[in-house]
Amino acid sequence: MVTPSQHALLAEGVAHLTDARTAPALCALLKQYLEELILFNTRAHLVHVTHTEELITHHLLDSLSAWPHFTNARAIADIGSGAGLPGIPLACALALYAPETELTLIERREKRIAFLENACARLALPHLRIVHADAHDLTPYTYDAITFRALCPLNHPTVYMLLNKLRPGGVILAYKGKRKLIEQETRDFLPQSCSVFPLHVPFLHEARHLVAIHTPCAAPPQ
């Protein structure tokens, strides 16, 4: 279960990233998700962490930190969602700020799907759904935004494949770390196709960025 000090850490982080009007409701949703994550992580090893506080800072708050960049999208896919990161924290925020947004968790591993089904059933968010599939099998031109955290480097062929799953004007929003590594991974992209936004994650003293990739970005690697 979530201890009072862990709850306080989560609540303070959420307050930094949102506003006083919605922070309590959002914190309540994230606490439910955190409880499911703690319960399943001990036996399913969904996320490698050493303590619950790390789950809060490095995963929940990190995922939540980019939510304002998703409010204009009406159909979002979280690719390789795994433990529901970043998709579930984003869905919790968007349920309050952009309630018509549909967010789909895409996951191909059976054990991860079982966890996602439990977590989503508990949260009961009407526009959050799960698809048990490989990203390659998704229908083209379906999403306004596609996101991922630890899927692959930005210059990997998978990224070019995902661009084909976007609607016209759509964007890939990828969570990344140091700016230098981002520059290395995007050096072959067209300059106008890629934007980098710093993310400020409460209590996390590491460089975090959100990379926006629009189509066309570059010729696919051979």
UniProtKB/Swiss-Prot annotation:
Q: Report the main location listed first in the record.
A: cytoplasm
Q: What is its EC number?
A: 2.1.1.-
Q: Which CDD domains match?
A: AdoMet_MTases
Q: Does the keyword Repeat apply?
A: no
**Protein's UniProt keywords contain S-adenosyl-L-methionine:** yes
> How would you classify this enzyme at the top EC level?
transferase
Q: Which residues form the signal peptide?
A: none
- Keywords, alphabetical: Cytoplasm, Methyltransferase, rRNA processing, S-adenosyl-L-methionine, Transferase
Q: Write out the GO cellular component annotations.
A: cytosol
Domain of life according to the entry = Bacteria
Xref: InterPro entries: rRNA_ssu_MeTfrase_G, SAM-dependent_MTases_sf
Task: List, in alphabetical order, the Gene Ontology terms for molecular function in this entry.
Answer: rRNA (guanine-N7-)-methyltransferase activity
Enumerate the subcellular locations listed in this protein's record, separating them with semicolons.
Cytoplasm
Q: Which residues bind S-adenosyl-L-methionine?
A: G80, L85, R149
- PANTHER family reported for this sequence: S-ADENOSYL-L-METHIONINE-DEPENDENT METHYLTRANSFERASES SUPERFAMILY PROTEIN
The function of this protein is:
Specifically methylates the N7 position of a guanine in 16S rRNA.
Q: Which family does it belong to?
A: Belongs to the methyltransferase superfamily. RNA methyltransferase RsmG family.
Q: What is this protein called?
A: Ribosomal RNA small subunit methyltransferase G
Its source organism is: Treponema pallidum (strain Nichols)
Q: Show the taxonomic lineage.
A: Bacteria, Pseudomonadati, Spirochaetota, Spirochaetia, Spirochaetales
